[in-house]
Amino acid sequence: MKLVKLSLVAALAAGAFSAANATPLEEAIKDVDVSGVLRYRYDTGNFDKNFVNNSNLNNSKQDHKYRAQVNFSAAIADNFKAFVQFDYNAADGGYGANGIKNDQKGLFVRQLYLTYTNEDVATSVIAGKQQLNLIWTDNAIDGLVGTGVKVVNNSIDGLTLAAFAVDSFMAAEQGADLLEHSNISTTSNQAPFKVDSVGNLYGAAAVGSYDLAGGQFNPQLWLAYWDQVAFFYAVDAAYSTTIFDGINWTLEGAYLGNSLDSELDDKTHANGNLFALKGSIEVNGWDASLGGLYYGDKEKASTVVIEDQGNLGSLLAGEEIFYTTGSRLNGDTGRNIFGYVTGGYTFNETVRVGADFVYGGTKTEAANHLGGGKKLEAVARVDYKYSPKLNFSAFYSYVNLDQGVNTNESADHSTVRLQALYKF
């Protein structure tokens, strides 16, 4: 009994001491920055009887998808900041036996890292669980997260230097978007690009931004080694300028390649290469672009990115054609050549109405030539910028696989997406 009393007294004393030394709430939150994203999507997709269902395309059935991220960044000591991101990701609705209902899904900690900044040498060290934001990974709100260290230096005007090391990845969040899972199943041993195991990822990058000949020149160089997978390299360069009076012109090109690790250098895998080029123009509310890309191997599985479509959105068009079998950037068998044109008009700098048209094909020597043939996609889209923080958008996409080795008749897939996006 005496021990219990002493323990209780000690606990009360410790509680009193803790309360006396607690940081007042007003002082605790004065250096905390809060930001985040709220996103709602309505998705529905339809496959005709000739189209083999592919989970990388939109197979939603009137699904309501919710995504919320809240970020807290706080200065915790001289030169140190802590960052935590809470994420909510759920989908409800649909019909049939596979209808979705997870409305009670909760928040989880998606990112958690510490940043040390030394202003004297313009260098930051970021350590912890963080979104990678590489050229080979998606840089949007659902990009690949890994645990590691990143060092960023800005001591040279117009040039950012970075080095990174990652020893684990949040693979479950990405599903079929992650390399080695890029097929209708998310089971790695059924993926076109098979990886028995993966090691650490090490890399470096140089990203520049320079005034050149009256325009803006933005070059990038990326190098990375993913143990037991491949040595990756990428070059991207974009030049923007104004010609004549009020005509904005941009030209961007990129090359992404890799050399496979010896463990994957066999008769089923090939080194990956991608060449992409795009030119765009804007004048008096009108915008248009013309581009094309070449990638893949017709006999063996290859990849050009690590996750989803990488950070190559500015060099692509359409919504779903680059997710079709044989054409996936994150691991597939097929040699692909595509060209595209986009255009649109923006009313009062708030509402844009536009369209994309992508046409090309895939040549493959895979079993039964799976994924091969001519392909096209047509997209109609509307975007409404209600305010700097709130945007509404919608698109309708139609994908067609021409009659060929995979279908006795042409196969169609269509999808509709409505979205509301708020950033704060």
From Swiss-Prot:
SUPFAM superfamilies the record matches: Porins (SSF56935)
Single GO biological process annotation from the record: monoatomic ion transport
One GO molecular-function entry: porin activity
Alphabetically ordered keywords of this record: Cell adhesion, Cell outer membrane, Ion transport, Membrane, Porin, Signal, Transmembrane, Transmembrane beta strand, Transport
Main location: membrane
Taxonomic superkingdom: Bacteria
GO terms for cellular component: cell outer membrane; pore complex
The keyword Transcription appears for this protein: no
Record's subcellular location: Cell outer membrane
Signal peptide annotation: 1-22
Pfam families named in the record: Campylo_MOMP (PF05538)
Subunit composition and interactions: Homotrimer and monomer.
Function: Assembles to form a functional porin. May be one of the structures responsible for adhesion to intestinal cells.
Name the UniProt record assigns to this protein: Major outer membrane protein
